[in-house]
Regions:
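N-terminal secretory signal peptides that target proteins for export/translocation
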Residues: 1-14
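Subset of outer-membrane beta-barrel
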Residues: 32-395
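Sec-dependent signal peptide recognition
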Residues: 15-21
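N-terminal signal peptide c-region/cleavage motif recognized by signal peptidases
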Residues: 26-28
């Protein structure tokens, strides 16, 4: 929650470089005496990389590591593309973000893939996150901060049931709109490593599709905004499973679950009685100066709350999808995050309709707390199957 509210703070004021950075890198301060009880969520830069961009995945609780492959697999598990039925497709996704707080923050992304033969595929996506307009304190200038990322991926079947993929990504973040010379645009390079297994199992007399997936995303450099500090990007480990059960010739239902953990170290908290200068020095040495790769390994055992704290860093999602005749879809899900890591808990619902060429999907978020800025978030996705488009025009 603190991550989301920090965006609203950014919209309200822009007094200094610190405010620019903390709008996306919130540093929570709590008054508890026991350091183990302090609110200390894992913080990252470029939070747009952690937002579910497509309506189908969002309607199922923000999951997609092992769901039936589709055009939007790039963000969830690129290794799924060789198992797609259509040879090629394009998608455009739009998400108005934090509409409970403001009306001009939005995420837009475009995705496409092409399957080469029967065993491999290439894919790419472009993600643009607009932070709206910010009027400077002097009122003499309006800036438009934004984040963007472009990535390409290659995936290949290594057996009849197993595939692997790798993606390369460039991330760019401009928080100041070139207004403050002391705050520079930041950039980072990252890679994803993913794998997917699709097999069939019998449950009674029904042959069901079982999907298992893993995606380690955003393994790469840290990002800096022109000062002496560098910030972690959201390196993430995602594991998923999905079971598709045919009911009869026209109906089927899928059940899916994902767990994910940020592979980013927790920020050290100030100890009772510790001098501020000593704390800042320790913070720089034990956090800001830690490399991204070292941070991955450190993230598994650095919580001030011990093993319990490490478990609290795990988010999980469950979702279901009902399909009628490959034309109509109904979806629902739930996403859970610990209170100590942000308390993002919400239900999701959605629907989809597939025509010969065009697929239309929508997703809607219902937060467990009405005050949650994610409440009533709507996502819309349009996708086009290029094979069907070629057939329509006789190519």
């Amino acid at each position: 929650m603190n991550k989301l509210l920090s965006l609203a703070t950014y919209k309200q004021n822009m007094k200094s470089k610190l405010l620019l950075l903390t709008s996306l890198l919130a540093l929570p301060v709590c008054a508890q005496d026991d350091i183990k009880d302090q609110f200390n969520p894992v913080m990252t830069a470029v939070v747009s990389q952690s937002i579910a961009g497509d309506a189908r995945a969002a309607a199922m609780g923000d999951l997609g590591a092992a769901t039936d492959p589709d055009v939007n697999s790039q963000a969830w598990n690129p290794a799924k593309y060789p198992f797609t039925i259509s040879r090629s497709a394009l998608a455009i996704n739009y998400t108005p973000w934090l509409r409970q707080l403001t009306n001009d923050i939005a995420l837009l992304n475009a995705v496409g893939y092409y399957r080469i033969g029967d065993y491999q595929a290439v894919s790419a996506s472009l993600r643009y996150f607009s932070l709206g307009e910010v009027i400077t304190e002097a009122g003499d200038m309006t800036i438009k901060p934004y984040e963007m990322a472009v990535d390409v991926a290659y995936s290949r079947m290594l057996s009849e049931t197993f595939s692997a993929g790798v993606a390369l990504r460039y991330i760019y973040s401009d928080l100041s709109g070139h207004y403050d010379d002391n705050v520079k645009p930041g950039s980072a390079f990252a890679a994803d490593i993913s794998a997917y297994n699709q097999s069939y199992v019998f449950i009674g007399q029904r042959e069901c599709q079982l999907g298992l997936g893993i995606n380690i995303s955003n393994i790469g450099s840290k990002i800096s905004y022109g000062d002496d500090y560098s910030y972690f990007i959201p390196t993430n480990l995602r594991l998923g499973a999905s079971l598709m059960v045919p009911i009869n010739e026209y109906n089927r239902i899928s059940f899916s679950a994902d767990v994910n953990k940020l592979l980013v170290p927790s920020m050290p908290l100030k100890h009772e009685g510790e001098e501020e200068a000593d704390y800042q020095e320790r913070l720089k040495t034990d956090y800001y100066d830690v490399s991204s790769i070292s941070g991955i390994f450190k993230s598994f055992g650095d919580s001030e709350r011990g093993f319990k704290g490490e478990l609290e860093e795990i988010q999980w999602s469950v979702g279901a999808e009902y399909c009628y005749n490959d034309k109509f879809f109904l979806r629902a899900g739930y996403h859970h995050e610990s209170e100590m890591q942000g308390n993002r808990k919400y239900y999701t619902v959605g629907a989809g309709f597939r025509m010969n060429v065009l697929n239309v999907d929508a997703g809607y978020t219902i937060a467990t707390e009405p005050s949650n800025p994610l409440d009533q978030t709507m996502r819309v996705s349009l996708s086009f199957e290029l094979d069907a488009l070629k057939d329509m025009f006789g190519y």
